[in-house]
Amino acid sequence: NVVASFERCVFVGNSAARAGASESFGSSQTRYTNCVFRNNTATGSSGGGALWIGTNSAVTARNSTFVANSATSLAGCIINTGGISTVSNCILWGNTGPGGATVGNQLTNSGGSTTVTYTILQGGFTGIGNLNTNPLFVDQAGANYRLQPGSPAIDSGSNSMVPAGTTVDFDGLPRFIDDPAVVDSGNGTAPIVDRGAFERQLPPPPPCPADLDGSGAVDAADLAALLNGWGGSGAADLDGNGLVDAADLASMLNAWGPCT
């Protein structure tokens, strides 16, 4: 048996009669994790714009994003013609076939076994945790499939579906980030994984220049450092006038306490 594993890969702009991006057949096993499939096209009469899954093959897609793939017939994104397919923590959105961006043009099961869980799939699909809700990409038209604040993909995946040892997303950034602005709706213990190839990263904390030692609070240690540098320059020169003076002391006292 052939086992192929793809992680943090992008499949873009490919075209073929049967499988726009990747074809699995025989007794092969293919796994995709943190991958992006976009603008792939199947031109034949029974193709899948992104994936074609043949008899006896097994395909697993986890935390991957499928957008803007197309087919001239059947499934614009994934077609399973007799294999076993498992799709978890993924996003399938805006893939088109003859009928437009319908559920059948996101994923068509034709004689195979398909399980979809904790996935955003346009048009909906039966399975635990699945959603039919706009994933709110940063810029779908510009192929930026990172997640906007408030995306339904944030903290809504299943931690148990993430392959063991996976610690980063497509960008190589931390895979498990808890967004305090979003109620956890996925499966597992916080932090809950996001759906799709990109984990929503938290914005950096606001600058706190008076926190000279980086402890997260302006406190006595910072005051001591400022007084030790009095009359000179350096990090304690908070207003950048070249001199640690009363103005810098006033700024520090005004910022006293935890950095927020």
What are these model-derived regions, one by one?
Residues 60, 146-148, 194, 217, ...:
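Short aromatic/basic micro-patch
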Residues 106, 140, 156, 170, ...:
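Generic detector of well-ordered alpha-helical packing
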Residues 14, 137, 172, 212-215:
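Extracellular/surface recognition and adhesion modules
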Residues 200-260:
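Cellulosome-associated attachment modules in secreted, modular CAZymes
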Residues 1-150, 162-163, 185:
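Predominantly extracellular beta-rich ligand-binding scaffolds that present long acidic/polar faces
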Residues 129-199:
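C-terminal accessory segments
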Residues 90, 119, 153, 172, ...:
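Residue-level detector of buried hydrophobic side-chain packing
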Residues 93, 122-124, 156-160, 198, ...:
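Phosphate/oxyanion-binding loops and surfaces in catalytic or ligand/nucleic-acid-binding neighborhoods
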